[in-house]
Amino acid sequence: MKPRARRRKRASATQLYQTCKATGTCPPDVIPKVEHTTIADQILKWGSLGVFFGGLGIGTGAGSGGRAGYIPLGSSPKPAITGGPAARPPVLVEPVAPSDPSIVSLIEESAIINAGAPEVVPPTQGGFTITSSESTTPAILDVSVTNHTTTSVFQNPLFTEPSVIQPQPPVEASGHILISAPTITSQHVEDIPLDTFVVSSSDSGPTSSTPLPRAFPRPRVGLYSRALQQVQVTDPAFLSTPQRLVTYDNPVYEGEDVSLQFTHESIHNAPDEAFMDIIRLHRPAITSRRGLVRFSRIGQRGSMYTRSGQHIGARIHYFQDISPVTQAAEEIELHPLVAAENDTFDIYAEPFDPIPDPVQHSVTQSYLTSTPNTLSQSWGNTTVPLSIPSDWFVQSGPDITFPTASMGTPFSPVTPALPTGPVFITGSDFYLHPTWYFARRRRKRIPLFFTDVAA
């Protein structure tokens, strides 16, 4: 077998470019790579004309992170201290040799020549007046020890409390403290006594200075959602001892206002089939549903357990209606009953004494027959209310015809449109006259009967 030839590594693009550029035998990928004329170089060249990334350190390899530097992850930069005193340049101290004199000679100032400038003449008035005397008597001056108080105020740039007003330091001028105060004049002052505000104990007003504009809604108990199964319980033990419906041997009872926990064996039977596999009964809730007071509890079933200990089961809403919510009965004001001498009376009318003759005012129930005749007929109907405001009586009864004189020739059709016949009245509406009640001396109330009139 012929041995395989060893593969030699190709020279780099820079080495090939140095030898093949002059002869023109360079591969097509060498010249663009060395002269930076590839597609990527063209994109960077023309894209840099519109976007500037200077100062960010991109592609420099310095690792400085740009002008701002790198910030470690999970930390924030420390705040810079600003507002402090500005640094001043140091004062240059000239070295002094041991042989140099300790007395510094004064440097004479050179004369300043103002060419063409007007001469300034100091004013003769104002300013200080200097009085000199040639007395040889030494002056006696009262020199006393004075204490000068100097106050320095330093501001901390890291902590500044804007709510505290810093007092101004005293002003010093020639060793004297200048204090100014307004002039206080004596005037008459009026004394006004203070009164105590009236504190009312009524609950009509708000209890706080800024009452809430609206009342926050109470949290709603989602008892009728689709995730809950609705089960009605009729056993009265559900109100007082619900644990008896779930298990038999549960001697510990914590009360009806707390949630109940139950632990079952692998095989068990509940006293009530509706409470099978119940592992938790939540605290009760009393609600109103469609005019009923309802006692509710939410139960959790433990139908399935996972290896991690999680239980999977449905949630059930157990409820029992206690009693209906009755509305308040409407109150009707009743008038007092007044006993009178007569059997029939009106509570709104004044008492009456006259007793009319029963013969003149007799109304009996009878059958009346009305037949057509040549005389004109006059109809009359009177309605008397139940409450009569005066002391007179009117009988209301059926329509009765009264014969009157003929005022002209009556109109009678030749052929009647409908067959005519006699009209019979079989009933009437009326009140009996009070005089008929006195026939009986017993104080007995006679009921009034109302009948309809049929024609």
UniProtKB/Swiss-Prot annotation:
It comes from the Viruses. GO terms for molecular function: DNA binding; structural molecule activity. It is found in: Virion; Host nucleus; Host early endosome; Host Golgi apparatus. The keyword Phosphoprotein applies. Its main location: virion. Keywords: Capsid protein, Cytoplasmic inwards viral transport, Disulfide bond, DNA-binding, Host endosome, Host Golgi apparatus, Host nucleus, Host-virus interaction, Late protein, Microtubular inwards viral transport, Phosphoprotein, Viral penetration into host nucleus, Virion, Virus entry into host cell. InterPro entries: Late_L2. One of its GO terms (cellular component) is host cell nucleus. A motif (Nuclear localization signal) lies at residues 1-11, 438-446. GO terms for biological process: microtubule-dependent intracellular transport of viral material towards nucleus; symbiont entry into host cell; viral penetration into host nucleus. Disulfide bonds join C20-C26. The keyword DNA-binding applies. HAMAP family: PPV_L2. Minor protein of the capsid that localizes along the inner surface of the virion, within the central cavities beneath the L1 pentamers. Plays a role in capsid stabilization through interaction with the major capsid protein L1. Once the virion enters the host cell, L2 escorts the genomic DNA into the nucleus by promoting escape from the endosomal compartments and traffic through the host Golgi network. Interacts with major capsid protein L1. Interacts with E2; this interaction inhibits E2 transcriptional activity but not the DNA replication function E2. Interacts with host GADD45GIP1. Interacts with host HSPA8; this interaction is required for L2 nuclear translocation. Interacts with host importins KPNB2 and KPNB3. Forms a complex with importin alpha2-beta1 heterodimers via interaction with the importin alpha2 adapter. Interacts with host DYNLT1; this interaction is essential for virus intracellular transport during entry. Belongs to the papillomaviridae L2 protein family. This is Minor capsid protein L2.
